[in-house]
């Protein structure tokens, strides 16, 4: 009982459904045709019996004028019963006398046997009635035999349709089985999932939908891995880079707590604590921005007006550094698809590096657009960067020989990250103003 309940509880397979649907679809016309043939056979056998009775009656009518005793047995139909009535006289060629029925054809029962009777009236020379009858036994036997053949043919047709559907369904469901096997083989490995199915249009559409879904899952999984790696990197780097300034802060605080310092010494120690705290805050802020940049996706990219972005950066830099002269080289409107906040961060960091580490008093911003993309240049008149250090300074926590010790070492790393996120590069050159030129190249979308 449990096995049957499990069998019926399971949803039929697609192959089984195709077979059942085909069998039902084939059974409907087969049953209609079979019913028509069935009724046709029944009527045809009955009509044949009626013609048999007509032949027997036509054979007997010529003998009626000779007398009732002259009526012979039918040579072609030995089992036909012929009964003749003339007045009160009744004559039959068998020991069975057929009853007098209405003209034409009629059914009757004699001795428990069903008979088909054909009655013919002869008006002259004397009113005479001839009744010719035969049993249904042979007709019923022949009809049943033909009916059995019809049933066998119909059953064979339905079974053949089901078998044919079963064979065709094997080819129809093959793409779906391949899809199921490929889907089962998908795991969290190092390669992107591939679902390739050829065959039925429906299977191809499902495969495309599955491929898209798996790709989205894969992308989200990669983003999760990247986020986890970024979090681990953030924790490791933070621990490494913050340990030294935190130790210095602790030492200074212990000095303030344990020693009775003069006012000028006390102010100097407090200044060191404040500077160390600012350095820690700047480092944490830069690390946070690096982590945010690593988690950005192509969905975050929007149209950006580079000319307007540089104009705002120039105005803000003037307010942040009152002694700095910032100029913007006029250029046509340049719009690209990118990360507005990230590009602004890169420009701001380039300006801040020029002021803090290069001692620049003048900064010039410019942008040039071409088919290859956009090139943003930040020129300054500061001390510049030695040629052998122009690649190293883009690494995290790397400082040039001319850099001050107050920075986090992440400013140019943020610039390089933004260049990479936009499919471009970041580099340092010698500026026409005498200092350094930072070039941020952004590739055009393909």
Curated annotation (Swiss-Prot):
Lineage of producing organism: Bacteria, Bacillati, Actinomycetota, Actinomycetes, Mycobacteriales
Pfam families: HAMP, HATPase_c, HisKA
Compartment(s) where it occurs, according to its Swiss-Prot or TrEMBL record: Cell membrane
ATP-binding among keywords: yes
The reaction(s) this protein catalyses: ATP + protein L-histidine = ADP + protein N-phospho-L-histidine
Main location: membrane
Keyword ATP-binding: yes
Transmembrane segment boundaries: 19-39, 151-171
Ranges where the HAMP domain occurs: 172-222
Major enzyme class: transferase
PROSITE patterns hit by this protein: HAMP, HIS_KIN
UniProt PTM: Autophosphorylated.
Any one Gene Ontology cellular component term annotated for this protein: plasma membrane
Domain of life: Bacteria
One MF term in the entry's GO annotations: phosphorelay sensor kinase activity
Cited function: Member of the two-component regulatory system PrrB/PrrA that is involved specifically in early intracellular multiplication of Mycobacterium and is essential for its viability. Functions as a sensor protein kinase which is autophosphorylated at a histidine residue and transfers its phosphate group to the conserved aspartic acid residue in the regulatory domain of PrrA. In turn, PrrA binds to the upstream promoter regions of target genes including itself to positively regulate their expression.
This protein's name: Sensor-type histidine kinase PrrB
Annotated ranges, domain Histidine kinase: 237-446
Membrane topology: Multi-pass membrane protein
Gene: prrB
């Amino acid at each position: 009982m449990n096995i049957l309940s499990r069998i019926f509880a399971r949803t039929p397979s697609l192959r089984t459904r195709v077979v059942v649907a085909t069998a039902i679809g084939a059974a409907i016309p087969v049953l209609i045709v079979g019913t028509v043939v069935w009724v046709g056979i029944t009527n045809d056998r009955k009509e044949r019996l009626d013609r048999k009775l007509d032949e027997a009656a036509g054979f007997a009518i010529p003998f009626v004028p000779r007398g009732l005793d002259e009526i012979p047995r039918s040579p072609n139909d030995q089992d036909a019963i012929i009964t003749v009535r003339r007045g009160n006289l009744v004559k039959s060629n068998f020991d069975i006398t057929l009853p007098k029925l209405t003209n034409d054809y009629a059914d009757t029962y004699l001795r428990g046997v069903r008979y088909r009777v054909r009655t013919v009236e002869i008006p002259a020379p004397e009113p005479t009635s001839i009744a010719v009858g035969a049993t249904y036994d042979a007709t019923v036997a022949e009809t049943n035999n033909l009916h059995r053949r019809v049933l066998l043919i119909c059953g064979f047709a339905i079974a053949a349709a089901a078998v044919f559907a079963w064979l065709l369904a094997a080819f129809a469901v093959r793409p779906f089985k391949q899809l199921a096997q490929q889907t089962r083989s998908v795991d969290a490995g190092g390669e992107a999932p591939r679902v390739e199915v050829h065959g039925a249009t429906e299977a191809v559409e499902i495969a495309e939908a599955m491929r898209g879904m798996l790709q989205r899952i894969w992308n989200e999984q990669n983003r999760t891995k990247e986020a986890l790696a970024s979090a681990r990197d953030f924790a490791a780097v933070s621990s490494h880079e913050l340990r030294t300034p935190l130790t210095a802060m602790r030492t200074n605080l212990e000095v303030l707590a344990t020693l009775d310092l003069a006012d000028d010494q006390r102010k100097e120690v407090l200044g060191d604590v404040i500077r160390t705290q600012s350095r820690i805050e700047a480092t944490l802020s830069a690390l946070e921005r690096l982590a945010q940049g690593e988690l950005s996706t192509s969905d975050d990219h929007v149209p950006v007006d580079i000319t307007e972005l540089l104009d705002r950066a120039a105005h803000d830099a003037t307010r942040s550094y009152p002694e700095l002269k910032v100029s913007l080289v006029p250029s046509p409107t340049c719009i690209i698809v990118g990360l507005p906040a990230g590009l602004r961060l890169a420009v701001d960091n380039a300006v801040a590096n020029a002021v803090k580490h290069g001692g620049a008093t003048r900064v010039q911003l410019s942008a040039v657009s071409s088919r290859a993309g956009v090139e943003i240049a930040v020129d300054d008149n500061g001390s510049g960067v030695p040629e052998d250090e122009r690649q190293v300074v883009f690494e995290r926590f790397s400082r040039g020989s001319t850099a001050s010790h107050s920075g986090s070492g992440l400013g140019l790393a943020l610039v390089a990250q933004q260049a990479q996120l936009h499919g471009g590069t970041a580099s340092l050159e010698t500026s026409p103003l005498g200092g350094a030129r930072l070039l941020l190249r952004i590739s055009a979308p393909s």
